[in-house]
């Protein structure tokens, strides 16, 4: 799988959503004007971030365990790399990215400091209103909680205002209703809904199809006979 694009049209929230949903393993490389960063993805989870001077060097160190030894990292310092080279870069949308599946040989167990759901929500908090409107396109949209929403939310580390928005997602409230009832600003509500959609905690409610009553063959035959007698 080759996933490429730029951060202005495809945000970190979108990228992580795709990789986490499909449980992909590989390396995501983002090139900004000032730095190039390699993000190591194991089963859809971001486990390490490190700057590289040349992209080809990423594919030289294919054994993840040996790379960790080479960089002299442990579980705590691996978490620090994500803070330094992922969380701190969320405001910068001038990068281009490419994800390549495979290449990196991961051990069976790799520590995950920040669950994908938490990183996706954090990325959503940095979206512009225009970016959120790609998914929240209409104030009359209605969302409902997914069957496993509690599991998703438990891993997302929601803020108080985000929980308030989630509570108002009940399959009946429109986006407009949520805006009015929450008392929160539009950008906060839209970012929250975007993030909750991306982690799979909520989904768009589909309108139920109203089936027209069908006439049985026997009843139809009787009606035809009556009409003939008129």
UniProtKB/Swiss-Prot annotation:
InterPro entries: PatA-like_N, Tscrpt_reg_TrmB_N, WH-like_DNA-bd_sf, WH_DNA-bd_sf. It comes from the Bacteria. Gene3D superfamilies: Winged helix-like DNA-binding domain superfamily/Winged helix DNA-binding domain. Pfam families: DUF4388, TrmB. This is Uncharacterized protein aq_1845. It comes from Aquifex aeolicus (strain VF5).
């Amino acid at each position: 799988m080759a996933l490429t694009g730029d951060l202005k049209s495809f945000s970190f929230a979108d990228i992580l959503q795709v990789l986490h949903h499909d449980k992909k393993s590989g390396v995501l490389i983002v090139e900004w004007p000032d730095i190039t960063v390699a993000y190591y993805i194991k089963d859809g989870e971001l486990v390490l971030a490190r700057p590289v001077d040349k992209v080809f060097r990423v594919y030289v160190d294919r054994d993840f365990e040996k790379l960790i030894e080479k960089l002299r990292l442990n579980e705590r310092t691996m978490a620090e790399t994500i803070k330094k080279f992922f969380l701190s870069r969320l405001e910068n949308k001038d990068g281009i990215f490419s994800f390549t599946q495979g290449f990196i040989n991961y051990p069976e167990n790799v520590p995950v400091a920040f669950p994908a759901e938490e990183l996706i929500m954090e990325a959503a908090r940095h979206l512009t209103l225009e970016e959120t409107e790609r998914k929240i396109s209409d104030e009359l949209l209605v969302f409902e909680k997914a069957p496993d929403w509690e599991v998703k939310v438990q891993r997302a580390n929601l803020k108080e205002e985000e929980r308030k928005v989630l509570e108002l997602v009940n399959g009946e409230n429109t986006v407009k209703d949520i805006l009015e009832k929450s008392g929160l600003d539009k950008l906060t509500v839209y970012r929250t809904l975007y993030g909750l959609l991306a982690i799979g905690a909520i989904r768009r409610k589909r309108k139920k199809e109203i089936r027209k009553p069908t006439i049985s063959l026997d009843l139809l035959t009787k009606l035809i006979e009556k009409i003939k007698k008129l």
